Every structure is written in C-alpha cells, then in structure tokens.
Amino acid sequence: MNRILSGSCLVFLLIFGLSCSKTKEKLTEFDIDYTNTLTVPASSYTVDVPAEFLTPEIPTESESKFSAQKTAKDHIDEIKMTRFNISVSSGDLSVLKSIDIYLKSTGQSDVLIASKSNIGSGVTSTSADLKDVNIKNYIFNDKIQFKVRLLIGGGSSFNQQIKMDQTIHVKAKLIK
C-alpha cells in the first residue's frame, strides 16, 4: 500500500513539476525622449481667456526605437509619460496662470497628459504634473502632436518660444 501511495505521489509531483516549468518571458523597460517647441505670439490670446495652440507634429520613430530595444509594437504592455518639462530661454513663465497639455494622434481622442498651475514668479522652467495615462496607442502611430491650452494672466505681454521636453517610459516583452 505504501508503494502505491509513494508511486502515486511521485507521479503527481513529476507531472505537476513539469507543468510548472514554463519558460518565463523576458521583460524590458526603457525611456524615449522627445523635444519640441511651441510658439506663442503675443497677439494670439486674450488675458484670462484660455487659448489653444498646436505644436508641430513630432515623428515618434517608435518602430526603430522598439527594434533597438529588441521588442516590437505587439510586445508593448504600457507606455506612460514620466517627464514633461516646460521652459523658456528669455523672460519667464510667471504670466501663465495654468497650462494643460493634451496628446493628439491619428485615430485617437485627445487625452490630457499633463498640467500645471500656480507657476511662481521669475520661473523659467517647470515640471508639469503628469496624469497616469497609458499612451501606447498614441506612440504606435508615426506622429504625435500636443495641444496646449494656456490661461495667461495680466501683466506683461507673453510672446514666447516654449520648449517642451518629454520622457516616456516603455514596459515591454523582449522578442524571442
């Protein structure tokens, strides 16, 4: 009886052990940086009324960037914005009451990805507050664009080139 019980346990452990020896998928994580500039002419807004501006389209180059990391579009789990810095080379950002940044891409709805309000006096650079949004379907497209909604307060005129630096973080499985 003990032999049968021992044999049954051995067979069970062998079958269970083999079924659990599934190969784990190898994962990778990496960052991609983008930079673009938005021109805000002084004549294009009214004080205390939101004004919207579009950046030029930005090539994502996602296929080549994924390939360089040994992954592909169908292996991507998530892509999230991890940094969105806003800066000006002359003057400052203090005339801005708030800024909302939306991501645009063909076939996708505009999505709010970052915002900033209460920008201090004399500030020439600030980090936007990021939203927790998976933007992988936007980055899969060939080009992205930002729609920027500014609320400009009173004071001096705001005629600026706003530099925007972004970092996205990609989580993916490696191609076997």
Per-segment meaning from a language model:
Residues 87-97, 154-157:
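Extended, low-complexity, turn-rich repeat/linker tracts enriched in Gly/Pro/Ser/Thr and Asp/Glu
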Residues 77-91:
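A short beta-strand element within beta-rich, extracytoplasmic domains
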Residues 21-24:
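Bacterial signal peptide processing site
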Residues 93-109:
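Short, surface-exposed beta-strand/strand-loop-strand elements in extracellular ectodomains
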Residues 40-77:
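Post-signal-peptide N-terminal segment of Sec-exported extracytoplasmic proteins
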Residues 126-167:
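Cysteine-clustered segments with highest specificity for TGF-beta superfamily mature ligands
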Residues 1-9:
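Bacterial N-terminal signal peptides that target proteins for export
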Residues 16-19:
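C-terminal motif of bacterial Sec signal peptides marking the signal peptidase cleavage site
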